[in-house]
């Protein structure tokens, strides 16, 4: 019985220690990618895309997110939110449009217009 308990504790310790090592490697991997990016312009922190300006940074999941610009003086220049879920094809076309989607302010929808109203 004691041998089983020792083996169980050893296995649990190895599992948790392995998880910590894996997390540390992932953090180092992100840091390495930032340091090794070779970006001479602006490096987006969320996506590690090299762009001309912070205004050009994409959302991490552009197919399902809207990039809402925030007013000057905010902690961040923009916030990425989930596109509103709707079965209305006309609304989906608006939200999928890279120009119209972020400008949309449709009553009753949690879009960029809603973000602006609730700051």
Swiss-Prot record:
Top-level division of the source organism's lineage: Eukaryota
InterPro entries: LCL2 (IPR034543)
Signal peptide residue numbers: 1-14
Purpose of the protein: Probable component of the endoplasmic reticulum-associated degradation (ERAD) pathway.
Keyword Signal: yes
Residue ranges the record marks as coiled coil: none
Protein name: Long chronological lifespan protein 2
Gene name of this polypeptide: LCL2
Family, as annotated: Belongs to the LCL2 family.
Keyword line: Signal
GO biological process: ERAD pathway
Organism field: Candida glabrata (strain ATCC 2001 / BCRC 20586 / JCM 3761 / NBRC 0622 / NRRL Y-65 / CBS 138)
């Amino acid at each position: 019985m004691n041998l089983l308990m020792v083996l169980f504790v050893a296995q649990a310790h190895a599992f948790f220690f392995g998880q910590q090592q894996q997390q540390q490697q992932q953090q180092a991997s992100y840091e390495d990618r930032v340091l090794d990016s070779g970006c001479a312009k602006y490096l987006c922190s969320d996506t590690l895309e090299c762009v001309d300006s912070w205004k050009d940074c994409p959302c991490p999941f552009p197919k399902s997110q809207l990039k809402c610009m925030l007013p000057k003086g905010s902690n961040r220049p923009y916030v990425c939110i989930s596109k509103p879920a709707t079965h209305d094809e006309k609304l989906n076309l608006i939200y999928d449009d890279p120009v119209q989607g972020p400008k949309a302010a449709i009553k009753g929808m949690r879009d960029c217009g809603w973000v602006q109203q609730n700051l």
